[in-house]
Curated annotation (Swiss-Prot):
It is an enzyme of class 1 (oxidoreductase). NADP(+) binds at residues 47, 51, 189, 191-192, 211-212, 216, 251, 253, 256, 276, 300, 302, 349. It comes from Saccharomyces cerevisiae (strain ATCC 204508 / S288c) (Baker's yeast). Belongs to the zinc-containing alcohol dehydrogenase family. Binds 2 Zn(2+) ions per subunit. This is NADP-dependent alcohol dehydrogenase 7.
Length: 361
């Protein structure tokens, strides 16, 4: 199959002009023996795309292509690829594009925590200085390990958000024993939190949804939550649900705004609070000494290839349907999505589609 020497994408010129992305051509990174090229057909828009675009996490390189929840078809395979990936496969690509594959973390299926050669799918330099370019583009080039086959019964627009948002909440659920007989809380019912409810329920847990007010109650119950707590409006909820939860996953955009003095009261002894929040880079978390007696708190980031495969298997077998709004890939489409994300007007994930009309005519 033919493919272009240069790729095209919708780029952000700088953080001050994030509402006006432009169509640009760019050189892909040099093709490696273990690389694949993927012709993109859909890409989810994650909150981290917005954080980067507006400069919350640091400087934005000129004409940066964002997007890291990618679905597409493999069009080129490196000479030393060994995962079984082949031309024509429909694959998903998440937030990671490279790891060292040699350290203890990589060898124990924790490559997402590799500190030796960790490259994100976008906005991250390779060792040669090339800045990775993401999925708001015609193609993406990356290591085969991070191109994962998608089950046939998961439509591309619904599969895309699983590759970052979905795996980010699934990994702590999986690692902390979410399943039948467990009581699991999800704090923050946004894009990731709504997937947390769906996935925890699909895994067999009793699910508690937590939000600040009552505006998310109806949606949370439709998603499958068994209980709903409006933390700023309901009275006496810490007493009502005392010692209730085995696991609480914090999906809100800010961890520092979580009231741990209240949250710890509803945790079982030995329970776990796991944060997957991705706040602004300067945010600080302050905890009272010994304020979490008998309860552990930790953080989690994305997930391994093995965990993504387990997630896709669960979604396929349980026919989990995340709530997605489709938008056309274009300068206007990306700007529209970011503008609505700024105001919180998303129910509950955006996926960019119509790549064939924009790039593959």
């Amino acid at each position: 199959m033919l493919y272009p020497e240069k790729f095209q994408g919708i780029g952000i010129s700088n953080a001050k002009d994030w509402k006006h992305p432009k169509l640009v051509s760019f050189d892909p990174k040099p093709f490696g023996d273990h690389d694949v090229d993927v012709e993109i057909e859909a890409c989810g828009i994650c909150g981290s795309d917005f954080h980067i675009a507006v400069g919350n996490w640091g400087p934005v390189p000129e004409n940066q292509i964002l997007g890291h929840e990618i679905i597409g078809r493999v069009v080129k395979v490196g000479s030393k690829c060994h995962t079984g990936v082949k031309i024509g496969d429909r694959v998903g690509v998440g937030a990671q594009a490279l790891a060292c594959f040699e350290c203890e973390r990589c060898k124990s299926d924790n490559e997402q925590y590799c500190t030796n050669d960790h490259v994100l799918t976008m906005w991250t330099p390779y060792k040669d200085g090339y800045i990775s370019q993401g999925g708001f583009a015609s193609h993406v080039r990356l290591h085969e390990h991070f191109a994962i086959q998608i089950p046939e019964n998961i439509p591309s627009p619904l599969a895309a958000p699983l590759l970052c948002g979905g795996i980010t909440v699934f990994s702590p659920l999986l690692r902390n024993g979410c399943g039948p007989g467990k009581r699991v809380g999800i704090v923050g019912i946004g894009g990731i939190g709504h997937m947390g409810i769906l996935l925890a329920k699909a895994m067999g847990a009793e699910v508690y949804a937590f939000s600040r007010g009552h505006s998310k109650r109806e949606d949370s119950m439709k998603l499958g939550a068994d209980h709903y707590i409006a933390m700023l409006e309901d009275k006496g909820w810490t007493e009502q649900y005392s010692n209730a939860l085995d696991l609480l996953v914090v999906c809100s955009s800010s961890l520092s705004k979580v009231n741990f003095d209240s949250i710890v009261k509803i945790m079982k002894i030995g329970g776990s609070i796991v944060s997957i929040a991705a706040p602004e880079v300067n945010e600080k978390l302050v905890l009272k000494p010994l304020g979490l007696m008998g309860v552990s708190i930790s953080s989690s980031a994305i997930g391994s290839r093995k965990e993504i495969e387990q997630l896709l298997k669960l979604v396929s077998e349980k026919n989990v349907k995340i709530w997605v709004e489709k938008l056309p890939i274009s300068e206007e489409g990306v700007s529209h999505a970011f503008t609505r994300m700024e105001s919180g007007d998303v129910k509950y994930r955006f996926t960019l589609v119509d790549y064939d009309k924009k790039f593959h005519k």
